[in-house]
């Protein structure tokens, strides 16, 4: 064998030059290919022509006219002609050896000229795969990179075959087109080293052709077995994806599946897996960025600015709310103004769900009906409602992480709530405006709690809003239009002139409680005040929006027709929807429950005169949590130790409970300050049961002077506070009247100026016309006589 110069080595990297970046790992391709044991790349130098042999092919023996050498035997090259191949290790190879590899060779891209025969040459692009670390999962690429070197089917043995255990290669001689020229000696597989060294013999034995080329073979690790394989392409943003190799895509796909396949996030999934992957994907495209409210890609209508509260202030508010929860009945009955003030400041996010349940009294409703929601959920619903509900699920906040996925847990819980309500209230059924309301509740609390909160909204806060015919919302539209006449006469006059019915723009506002209109920060603040103060807040918010949209002459100049006005109402100004501005305007607007009830009576009377009786008669509307609390106390009066056992309310309540089959309440627990224990109740035969028994009353005969003085003081303070509140309300009404008067004067002044301007324009047009007629008139008489009387009158007129 001829001896030549030393083996070629890779040129050193320049000082300060960064190493070439490693591309992402690529797994093995389907079909026949060469594989070796996992580990770092191994570079082997051989002096024989190289060809690829697939695993399982019979390794040919040495034929006459060829030279058999060991893959691990280092050889020298006589010229700069080398061959670069990228191979993969065989899983059958022993996994006991680890080989270090230079970092400079990792990820190198080399252009190789392969000579498949002695006469023809083909040039192919070979991309060497980087070496993943231990435990790094590999993935099977979906398509083959252009120009990648692939393993061919087994070929017939040719002269110049090099056989090695675990790595078998064949190839011809080629010129190096680019890349690192490297030749290192390494052992691939378990090839026994030939102690005899290079083989040299007489003609007819295995000899290397001259000049001897150097074939540099880079071996990449093989993929893990299929059992431990995990496909990274199907991994969603919230959890692991579907394990297993990539399967062939089906011939027919749904629209969502096809979109997901095009976006590269969906493979052929089993039938029991959602095509959306996870709840944080929209149409198969994972969106990891969410705002603090859970909206993907930013908050709902993110153009508004959100107010930031210092952390210490937020913690203090949380402690105050927790203290109120511990004595809730006391706070509602005695210090409701403080509760209302704290609701207007904003309920802390961590306690908002609990506060909504306490304010609406849905917590007590849930405790009184244990297992009722599960019973309604198991019942069979009306198919006509269930079909409509299922169609509306994907329309509710599609950019929120709870409802982004088709069939996700958010849509499933929403379906359960709406279905249960149709069974709980079969006379009302389902209204499409209930879905966004239930969705907002689901964002803050579990399904069962959200259901009872929805029941309270539909029964106590907005009765009749979601019934057939929508008569209650039409009646409230008339009430709203009457209140608008007081709050903003200019907007009221414009809407009446354009003949725009209130139902055209306020239906979505009222029925969805502005959940689909305002920025999300403002929506939560409005809902906080709504649960505390009732429907009055909805009227106030709508009046503020209209006053700041159509309440001035400058704003009405762009709303000359009905279309322009409706377009303006669909695109409300951002300033009036901003959280702090909106809350400030709503709290200062002088619209009370008395106004609403007075207008309700007047509009109901007009309705009966023009349209007849209401088809659906809802229950009485309650204005906020205090009214709900007082109604609950009236329906269930507390039995204290001083109450008579034979009093009429007590007998009625006991009789009603006996008829209903409910167990009688336990006797009241005696306290230390309750006084002496009453003796046996003595009832004469002729004593009427409505009269209290003298022996059953354990109330002390008199109270101390200190207690009476404190009670009088408390009553006096309450009266003073009520007077102050009335005075402030009158002052606000006076200021509002002054503002309306000023607006009317401004409007009159502008109308006067407009008339003057039009008058001046008409005068100017008249002068021009007069001069034109003089110039176009007949020429003056040559004899110097006077003009005719008609001509004189014409000039005098103009």
Swiss-Prot record:
One of its GO terms (molecular function) is GTPase activator activity. The modification Phosphothreonine is found at residue 136. InterPro entries: Rab-GAP-TBC_dom (IPR000195), Rab-GAP_TBC_sf (IPR035969), Rab_GAP_TBC_domain (IPR050302). Residues 66-79, 136-161, 641-662 have a biased composition (Low complexity). GO terms for cellular component: cytosol; plasma membrane. Residues 705-764, 783-798 have a biased composition (Basic and acidic residues). One of its GO terms (biological process) is regulation of GTPase activity. The keyword Flavoprotein does not apply. Residues 702-769 form a coiled coil. It comes from the Eukaryota. SUPFAM superfamilies: Ypt/Rab-GAP domain of gyp1p. It is found in: Cytoplasm. Residues 346-534 form the Rab-GAP TBC domain. Residues 693-702 have a biased composition (Polar residues). The modification Phosphoserine is found at residues 22, 129, 644, 647, 650, 664, 673. PROSITE patterns: TBC_RABGAP (PS50086). PANTHER family: RAB GTPASE-ACTIVATING PROTEIN 1-LIKE, TBC1 DOMAIN FAMILY MEMBER 10B. Acts as a GTPase-activating protein for RAB3A, RAB22A, RAB27A and RAB35. Does not act on RAB2A and RAB6A. This is TBC1 domain family member 10B. The gene is Tbc1d10b.
């Amino acid at each position: 064998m001829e001896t030549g110069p030393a083996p070629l080595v890779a040129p050193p990297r320049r000082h300060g030059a960064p190493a070439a970046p490693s591309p992402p790992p690529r797994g093995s391709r389907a079909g026949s290919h060469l594989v070796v044991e996992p580990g770092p790349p191994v570079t082997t130098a051989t002096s024989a022509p190289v060809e690829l042999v697939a695993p399982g092919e019979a390794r040919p023996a040495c034929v006459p006219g060829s030279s058999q050498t060991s893959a691990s035997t280092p050889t020298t090259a006589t010229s700069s002609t080398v061959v670069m191949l990228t191979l993969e290790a065989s899983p059958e190879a022993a996994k006991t050896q680890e080989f270090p590899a230079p970092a400079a060779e990792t990820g190198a891209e080399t252009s190789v000229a392969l000579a498949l025969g002695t006469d023809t040459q083909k040039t192919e692009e070979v991309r060497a795969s980087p070496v993943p670390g231990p435990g790094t999962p590999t993935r099977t690429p979906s398509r083959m990179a252009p120009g990648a070197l692939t393993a061919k089917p087994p070929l017939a043995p040719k002269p110049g075959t090099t056989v090695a255990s675990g790595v078998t290669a064949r190839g011809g001689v080629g010129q190096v087109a680019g890349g690192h020229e490297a030749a290192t000696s390494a052992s691939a597989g378990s090839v026994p080293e030939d102690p005899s060294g290079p083989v040299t013999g007489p003609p007819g034995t295995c000899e290397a052709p001259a000049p001897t080329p150097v074939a540099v073979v880079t071996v990449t690790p093989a993929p893990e077995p299929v059992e431990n394989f995990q496909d990274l392409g199907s991994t969603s943003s919230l959890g692991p994806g579907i394990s297993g190799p990539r399967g062939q895509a089906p011939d027919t796909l749904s629209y969502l599946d096809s979109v997901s396949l095009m976006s590269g996030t969906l493979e052929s999934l089993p039938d029991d897996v959602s095509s959306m992957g996870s709840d944080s994907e929209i149409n198969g495209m994972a969106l990891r960025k969410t705002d603090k409210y859970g909206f993907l890609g930013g908050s709902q209508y993110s153009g508004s600015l959100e107010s930031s509260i210092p952390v210490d202030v937020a913690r203090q508010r949380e402690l105050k709310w927790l203290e109120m929860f511990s004595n809730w009945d006391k706070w509602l009955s005695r210090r409701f103004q403080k509760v209302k003030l704290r609701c207007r400041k904003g309920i802390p996010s961590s306690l908002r769900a609990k506060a909504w349940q306490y304010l609406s009294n849905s917590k007590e409703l849930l405790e009184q009906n244990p297992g009722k929601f599960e019973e309604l959920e198991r019942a069979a619903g009306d198919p006509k409602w269930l079909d409509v509900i299922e169609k509306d699920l994907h329309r509710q906040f599609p950019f929120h992480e709870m409802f982004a996925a088709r069939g996700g847990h958010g849509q499933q819980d929403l379906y359960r709530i709406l279905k249960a309500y149709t069974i709980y209230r079969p006379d009302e059924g389902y209204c499409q405006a209930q879905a966004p309301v239930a969705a907002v509740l689901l964002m803050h609390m579990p399904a069962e709690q959200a259901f009872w909160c929805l029941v309270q909204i539909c029964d106590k806060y907005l009765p009749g809003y979601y019934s057939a015919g929508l008569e209650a919302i039409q009646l409230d539209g008339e009430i709203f239009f009457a209140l608008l006449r007081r709050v903003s006469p200019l907007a009221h006059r414009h809407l009446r002139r354009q003949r725009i019915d209130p139902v055209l723009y306020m239906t979505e506002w009222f029925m969805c409680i502005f959940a689909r209109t305002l920025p999300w920060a403002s929506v939560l603040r409005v809902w906080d005040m709504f649960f505390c103060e009732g429907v009055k807040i909805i009227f106030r918010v709508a009046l503020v929006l209209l006053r700041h949209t159509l309440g001035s002459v400058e704003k009405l100049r762009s709303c000359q027709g009905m279309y322009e006005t409706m377009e303006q109402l669909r695109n409300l100004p951002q300033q009036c929807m901003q959280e702090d501005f909106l809350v400030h305007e709503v709290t200062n607007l002088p619209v009370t429950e008395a106004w609403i009830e007075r207008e309700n009576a007047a509009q109901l009377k007009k309705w009966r005169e023009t349209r007849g009786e209401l088809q659906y008669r809802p229950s009485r509307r309650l204005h906020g949590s205090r009214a709900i609390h007082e109604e609950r106390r009236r329906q269930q009066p507390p039995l204290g130790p001083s109450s008579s056992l034979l009093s009429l309310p007590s007998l009625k309540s006991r009789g009603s409970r006996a008829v209903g089959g409910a167990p009688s309440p336990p006797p009241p627990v005696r306290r230390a300050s309750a006084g002496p224990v009453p003796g046996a109740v003595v009832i004469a035969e002729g004593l009427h049961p409505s009269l209290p028994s003298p022996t059953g009353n354990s109330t002390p005969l008199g109270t101390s002077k200190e207690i009476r003085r404190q009670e009088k003081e408390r009553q006096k303070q309450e009266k003073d506070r009520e007077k102050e509140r009335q005075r402030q309300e009158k002052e606000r009404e006076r200021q509002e009247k002054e503002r309306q008067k000023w607006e009317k004067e401004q409007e009159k002044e502008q109308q006067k100026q407009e008339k003057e301007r039009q008058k001046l324009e008409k005068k100017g047009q008249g002068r021009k016309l007069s001069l034109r007629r003089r110039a176009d008139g007949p020429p003056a008489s040559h004899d110097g006589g006077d003009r005719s009387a008609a001509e004189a009158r014409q000039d005098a007129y103009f």
